[in-house]
Amino acid sequence: MNKLYIGNLSENAAPSDLESIFKDAKIPVSGPFLVKTGYAFVDCPDESWALKAIEALSGKIELHGKPIEVEHSVPKRQRIRKLQIRNIPPHLQWEVLDSLLVQYGVVESCEQVNTDSETAVVNVTYSSKDQARQALDKLNGFQLENFTLKVAYIPDEMAAQQNPLQQPRGRRGLGQRGSSRQGSPGSVSKQKPCDLPLRLLVPTQFVGAIIGKEGATIRNITKQTQSKIDVHRKENAGAAEKSITILSTPEGTSAACKSILEIMHKEAQDIKFTEEIPLKILAHNNFVGRLIGKEGRNLKKIEQDTDTKITISPLQELTLYNPERTITVKGNVETCAKAEEEIMKKIRESYENDIASMNLQAHLIPGLNLNALGLFPPTSGMPPPTSGPPSAMTPPYPQFEQSETETVHLFIPALSVGAIIGKQGQHIKQLSRFAGASIKIAPAEAPDAKVRMVIITGPPEAQFKAQGRIYGKIKEENFVSPKEEVKLEAHIRVPSFAAGRVIGKGGKTVNELQNLSSAEVVVPRDQTPDENDQVVVKITGHFYACQVAQRKIQEILTQVKQHQQQKALQSGPPQSRRK
């Protein structure tokens, strides 16, 4: 994406005019300006320079009295599903952006782009061409917190190479936000092992010492520890701290971290730097609750075992631009290195548990794209579910055949109600918009009630999104112990005449349903039907188990309704003849 389109040019525009504009803006080009009538093309050295040119010049520079337009050059055949959204407010919460994007279709991926500007930039992939076109039309020029969004196509090479019959359906079989297809129909895809990197924050003044003369020091650390180390020194120009990403085995990562700590402490002595140099680890918020532990027990134990003092940045600092929390460890080199081992051990454990949970039962919901639902940290690099070879015809969401509104009563820990509602109701409002569902929390049945009922009303896809986010929030906020799965109870109401079909002869159907979903499914006996002649089915289990059970029960109900309709049609003609 380093080729630029320059539009709104006057007929008198010459290559020398454009050369002068780019030179004044200190933006290099890697080839001549190809000037046509009213527009031109040019290549930048790389994608980051192209983005800088767009942000610095588009709509801000005039040539012969006309403001020039600068965008990525995208051939028509590649203007399909991918958009770049620029000028996003820097402090915007992820969920606000999510809720805005999903208004126009299914978001397969949403990836933040590193940029030097104060505002944020994301690349978004929708599941179809029509959805992307609608998002472009509606969001370009959209006012968001006094910022005007700028939206343009970026090349969609993958979709352009697909069979034309498949393109409009937007079904690519993606298993991960932003990942490419892992194979073709009939092929066997091998899942690449995925490691969780260690991310550090270091004072900018020590970056030179860490890299060393001509990169010698960092190369030496990389070689000795068998690590891949990226020092992000060009990002966030002028920032007091820079991030470092280390990817290796747990042992290699810890060794590299300790080497970097030793270099910083030595450099501090050499330059007579008197301030304390803590170890700062960046971790996605989804893992932090489990690192802290119930009542802070996990963190206290690490502090005691390593003789360090550990603090974590507040939730309020999380923004679209910064989805990570900063874990600050104070101590000497040895104690900080030990603390890093224990902290990352806990974070990796949470990460692996989440992956296992994501993969568990995922094959029972075909084409499930978990990350597009925002149920997993977009920065964590979660691998796709191991559900066999993906198909190009597989949709990115569960294929919900019916769009009828359903009502589910989900019972959550009473202590988690505040987290679900959020400050001044912001979280539950955003969740409702994101899922496209009505979400209400019923009053407590008693002052000392341990659970509260959440009433979720919406079609199947909205149920999936809303329930998934609620499960995730309870896990994230540490309302269950770190090694436990979140298991909630859900109630759905079914017509009393259909309850027998859910149970099956001798309980056969309900037993098969429990074996299939791993959820506990109970149809209480001797229930008195309510005023709508309905009875309750209770489902208890982790998120995927509950979802599979709910969908299977809805399938049974659909079959019962169809059977009734057929009987009514068959009995219709004789009744009319009798009249």
From Swiss-Prot:
Expressed in fetal liver, fetal lung, fetal kidney, fetal thymus, fetal placenta, fetal follicles of ovary and gonocytes of testis, growing oocytes, spermatogonia and semen (at protein level). Expressed in cervix adenocarcinoma, in testicular, pancreatic and renal-cell carcinomas (at protein level). Expressed ubiquitously during fetal development at 8 and 14 weeks of gestation. Expressed in ovary, testis, brain, placenta, pancreatic cancer tissues and pancreatic cancer cell lines. Keywords: Cytoplasm, Isopeptide bond, mRNA transport, Nucleus, Phosphoprotein, Repeat, RNA-binding, Translation regulation, Transport, Ubl conjugation. One of its GO terms (molecular function) is RNA binding. Changing residue 294 to E: Partial reduction in interaction with m6A-modified mRNA. GO terms for biological process: anatomical structure morphogenesis; CRD-mediated mRNA stabilization; mRNA transport; negative regulation of translation; nervous system development; regulation of cytokine production; translation. Residues 177-187 have a biased composition (Low complexity). All KH domains contribute to binding to target mRNA. Domains KH3 and KH4 are the major RNA-binding modules, although KH1 and KH2 also contribute. The KH domains are also required for RNA-dependent homo- and heterooligomerization. The integrity of KH domains seems not to be required for localization to stress granules. The keyword Transmembrane helix does not apply. The modification Phosphoserine is found at residue 184. The keyword Transferase does not apply. This is Insulin-like growth factor 2 mRNA-binding protein 3. The lineage of its organism: Eukaryota, Metazoa, Chordata, Craniata, Vertebrata. There is a cross-link at residues 450, 475 (Glycyl lysine isopeptide (Lys-Gly) (interchain with G-Cter in SUMO2)). The modification Phosphothreonine is found at residue 528. CDD domains: KH-I_IGF2BP3_rpt1, KH-I_IGF2BP3_rpt3, RRM1_IGF2BP3, RRM2_IGF2BP3.
